[in-house]
UniProtKB/Swiss-Prot annotation:
Member of a perinuclear network that controls recombination at multiple loci to maintain genome stability. Required for rDNA repeat stability. The gene is NUR1. This is Nuclear rim protein 1. PANTHER family: NUCLEAR RIM PROTEIN 1. Belongs to the NUR1 family. The modification Phosphoserine is found at residues 3, 417, 474. Interacts with CSM1. GO terms for cellular component: nuclear membrane. It is a multi-pass membrane protein. Its main location: nucleus.
């Protein structure tokens, strides 16, 4: 063996020693933390338990565990009534109660000593020294301890199921009081910190009552305003895991087995009881609650589809109508509500006064003649019947002066174009001779033959048909009216 091998072995031994020291120091730190701060360990254990999804193990763990505990309690009670109870006297008789060998008076007489010794050997000595009765005595003590543990566990499960799963809801928008013992009225002052400071200043008994009962109830609240009152609902919501554990390890079966003489025929009653309780609570009542939840979800979805979504879609369709100035803002600034009589009220928010103001009622727009609609757009002057204007376009109040000037300019341009067309005597092929032109372009003011000659002699004759169509369909081209 060389020197290098010796060095490697020494190095390996040092690593093992270092790991052992680290493990010992880690165990020492853990024991020190356990002894000095047990609440931290309890907090860690509670966090680990809360992170487990117990409802996922309701069918696979809770129900088999409850049935196993019930069967175990039945077997123990069966052995107690049929094995321990017949030998109760032999197991509980004291060994020194009639021990005649300890009597000094009997020792003086030989014949009495012989009788006492024979009696001792035949009865008491055999009863207390036999392995059979020693085993029964051990089993009796074990059964008592196990029954005490099972009764305590069943009591904990029952109390946890009936009193340990409550959630409190504060209902601030509920106005109608329902006849429910879990619904109570409270004052809004109970939510403030001053209320808890007042409780801390009271006696120990008042603090204990608040701890077990919850927040106080100030009575019927007759003289208080509705805005100062809110309802508090204390709802019982047990978990699915605890429901299955309570049904399979029910206190009714435990009480029945505790106060009755258990035999093999009692197993039929226990099996029937377990099946009926599981069928009523798990397969009927709990599924009924799930069905009510489905109906509530369906009703809420129907209300959302028929009322909320329909109104949102209608408002979005109105907001996204195309106009000359682009789409409108999607932020609703006018709010529509209804009074108690069913009348529609339109309100707008005033940022200066910081309050809503009602808008004046507007009559429904009835489609009238073209001249009537033109008059409505800002007091435009009268026009003749042979003039055409865009129909079906609603101008905003902000742009009404702009479009009023455009309409007047359009009227003047159309009148001048009619005079030029009458003098020229040339019309487009697809143009009605009795109908004036709607365009303001200077090309429409000249005859068709002159325009064709001017175009052929210009530099634009090299453009093909596709280039002309792309120019005419350019997005920069503005339309001041809609075609019907």
């Amino acid at each position: 063996m060389g020197s290098n091998d010796l060095i490697n072995e020494a190095y390996d031994d040092s690593e093992v020693v270092g790991e052992e020291r680290e493990s010992k120091s880690a165990w020492m730190k853990r024991w020190y933390q356990l002894l000095t701060s047990p609440l931290d360990l309890q907090l860690v254990i509670n966090e680990k338990l809360e992170m487990i999804n117990w409802d996922a193990y309701a069918k696979s763990l809770a129900k088999p565990l409850g049935n196993f505990l019930t069967i175990l309690f039945f077997i123990i009670r069966l052995l107690q009534d049929n094995l321990i109870k017949p030998n109760y006297y032999k197991l509980n008789v004291k060994s020194g109660a009639f021990d005649l060998s300890k009597s000094n008076k009997l020792k003086e007489f030989d014949y009495l000593w012989e009788i006492s010794s024979s009696f001792q050997n035949s009865n008491q000595f055999y009863a207390f020294q036999s392995w059979y009765f020693v085993t029964l005595r051990f089993l009796n003590n074990l059964f008592r301890f196990t029954i005490f543990i099972l009764l305590s566990l069943n009591l904990y499960v029952s109390c946890k199921f009936m009193f340990g799963y409550f959630k409190t809801y504060n209902l601030f928008h509920l106005k109608k009081e329902f006849n429910s013992p879990n619904l109570t009225k409270h004052n809004l002052k109970d939510l403030s910190k001053e209320y808890y400071e007042d409780i801390y200043k009271q006696s120990l008994w008042s603090m204990l009552k608040h701890f077990f009962r919850g927040s106080r109830d100030d009575g019927p609240h007759v003289n208080q305003n509705e805005d100062e009152i809110f309802f508090q609902l204390r709802k019982w919501i047990p978990t699915n895991f605890m429901i299955n554990l309570f049904v399979s390890f029910s206190p009714t079966a435990i009480v029945f087995l505790s106060f009755s003489d258990v035999s093999f025929t009692s197993a039929i009653a226990i099996v029937f009881h377990q099946y009926i309780l599981d069928y009523i609570i798990t397969k009927r009542f709990q599924r009924s609650v799930d069905d009510d939840l489905i109906l509530s979800s369906a009703a809420l979805q129907e209300y959302e589809d028929k009322h909320i979504m329909a109104r949102i879609n209608q408002c979005s369709n109105i907001d996204t109508l195309s106009s000359a100035m682009g789409t409108r803002s999607k932020t609703p600034r006018i709010f529509t509500t209804h009074s108690l009589c069913g009348e529609e009220i339109r309100e707008v928010y005033n940022y200066e006064k910081r309050e809503f103001e009602a808008l004046p009622k507007m009559t429904e727009s009835v489609p009238g003649s073209r001249e009537t609609r033109i008059k409505d757009y800002g007091g435009i002057s009268q026009v003749s019947d042979n003039q055409s204007h865009p129909i079906g376009f609603h101008y905003s109040p902000r742009m009404s002066p702009y479009y009023r000037d455009k309409v007047l300019d359009n009227n003047l341009a159309q009148s001048s174009s009619n005079e030029n067309l009458e003098k020229g005597g040339a019309f487009l092929p697809n143009q009605d001779q009795n109908r004036p032109s709607k365009s303001l372009s200077p090309l429409r003011k000249t005859p068709l033959s002159a325009r064709q000659k001017r175009f052929e002699g210009s530099e634009f004759n090299v453009l093909n048909k596709n280039d002309i169509n792309s120019i005419l369909r350019s997005p920069k081209k503005k339309k001041n009216y809609h075609k019907r």
